[in-house]
């Protein structure tokens, strides 16, 4: 990240397409082309992990496995694993949202047919290599999902068989034999995910676009990690979390945020040389060029809440592993291309940790206008060079939604700060201010480029339902959007030097 650069935040699920959710298919390749035409350097996405209840990519059944919802059906058709007739069904009434319940019902039979066709042809060398190389996480994941399905998708602590809850060898061998077909299904679909994702990433990298991935700091209570490696977490004898993660109360959340994720047993991880973290980050760097770590402050100190608590007001700050973790991982992996999500309550220890690692932190422009205070560190004239600047994150409202709900004083301060003209869309005004900052890297949220309101918001923290569903349509990505993004990218010296494309000339050629 040595030069001034920019990118776009757009999750895979939000891409347009024919099958109810964005995928690794044509629309993803088209999006790379859009980034090239607008001279971007980065495509930032949310976590790619398999989602569980609530559909959040930050609550996954595995810290390593991929989300099979993103497997593209058209690619499977091209490979002869399914037919077009297999996907001729209603994938949702509204192309601007994801219907996860519908996907859960309809995707599995299609993927099962593809898996059967794949296995009927004989296991390929590429598949056998994948299974061998990824066995350390792939086998426990396949076991967990197959057994979980046999118990009606209940979390492992609710399984009625005590022997398999505790992974006793005889019980595990019996389930592996009985559920052999289900285990193979999960191995093969993870292979499909891996093949399609790496083909897409190669296309992006070949076109000088780097992928910024996202890694949640915590794992879910209902996850293979809790089942297979409980010693890495603070649990009781039954495997239930003794305490969970969250955030204390603040002006935005009077009761705090109760995430419910189990807390790590950092002493056990330290005794193991933080090997689990090295493996997790290594797996992430195989998927992404840069990794954003969510809730970075949790490595300095984290808010620990009793598992029985009804909200996050009852808790305490507990010291985290600090620099020792990153020192150990760096010794094992080398340089770490990481972005530290350092938002929220920041004290001197967190700042010192971020500076010790050298990781760039984050700045959120929407925060800068709250309180109408020119001294706010989230206003561009205070940004450090070593930072990644955003209008907002997946947890923020879109710029238009935020502006509509802001006070008259905040709107007036915002307009005056940005020297905004009446006819200038507020989303474009904030993006203009963002790209003009001294921060080495800026990331535009796709919804803001499209000037969308609160209905396109990705997530409202501490709420269930209606989150993670927004999708873009092909018609929304217009020539004027491209021209605006290209314009501010070039004007503020963020253009990718490898992309010497005149978007206007290319559009004229396409029309011919």
Labelled PLM ranges:
Residues 186, 190-219:
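Conserved, well-ordered alpha-helix/loop/beta-strand core segments that scaffold catalytic motifs
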Residues 36, 197-205, 330, 354-355:
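Surface-exposed amphipathic alpha-helices with a cationic face
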Residues 26-51, 287-288:
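Catalytic domains of carbohydrate-active enzymes, especially glycoside hydrolases
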Residues 451-510:
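Structured C-terminal cap/extension of enzyme domains
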Residues 26-33, 195-203, 277-279, 426-430:
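Short alpha-helical segments and helix-capping/turn motifs at coil-helix boundaries
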Residues 1-13, 29:
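N-terminal regions that are enriched for targeting/export leaders
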Residues 2, 11, 55-190, 219-443, ...:
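Alpha-amylase-like alpha-glycosidases and glucanotransferases acting on alpha-linked glucans and related
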